[in-house]
Amino acid sequence: MKIHHDKHHATYVANINKATEGKDEVPVLDLMESAIEAGPAVRNNGGGHYNHAFFWQEMAPPDQAAKTKPSEQLQALIDKSFGSLDEMKAQFEARAAPGALFGSGWVWICVNQAGDELKLVGTPNQDNPLMKGAVEDGIMFPILGLDVWEHA
């Protein structure tokens, strides 16, 4: 994880800073939404930075993670969208299994824009569900993401 954080993520940060140098600051959600249209430097490095920053925030030590339970609202969405927490976990694990996503990328559990349904999606490379055009169902908001690149 140290190499992943100190090398891979640090490179994305340096490269997105270079790609956006001299430009007005924009909120990260706006940057992600327009990343595909902005070109490969913003798409790949902005996505890489966002995805990894998100990934670090969702991590917890195993003993803490084992005690964590979904809120009532989240549990209701899980039940509506997947049937149960165990079924959501099983589908997530299957989608993240080696070979399930062609090439390298990320697997995400997202909430749709209406806030009433969860979806399991995969994105190639450093794309994410906040990018316009990255997933079939339009822009969605990630609540869980997993790096499934070969180095991860």
Language-model segments: what does each one mean?
Residues 1-152:
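Feature for soluble, non-membrane regions of globular proteins
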